[in-house]
Amino acid sequence: MKIAIASFTRNGCAWNQKLCAALKKHSCEGYALEKYGKEAGIPAIAPSLPAWTERMFQKMDAILFIGACGIAVRSIAPYVKSKKTDPAVLCMDEQGKFVISLLSGHIGGANELTEEVAAVTGAVPVITTATAVSYTHLTLPTKA
């Protein structure tokens, strides 16, 4: 998967770098607000968050926002089209406590990526897709 990771705080930048290094089976690109990214050596989210999000929506398989869900939702809203074509979108708080599969969970791979990010960070994975949480996509054994 081609993954873009966006961070908005100093602590978010630390997670950004850790995740880019740890998710080795993927191709990760880290980005940050200029004032924090500059000191961490992470490219800036530029020229603006909306323009960056539009570009990432077109070229990446997944986007992970390290920050408030509100930032993620407002950033992706203009570009959401279809669960069949939209990239996976995740959101993780800057303390690394929770990672949320926000968009394209099942088809786009956000649920699986959420589990991978949680394994790296120790975060609680938050997955709300009905088939994932109720196991309705599995054939469960029945008692004889």
Annotated model-derived regions:
Residues A88-S134:
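Long, charge-dense
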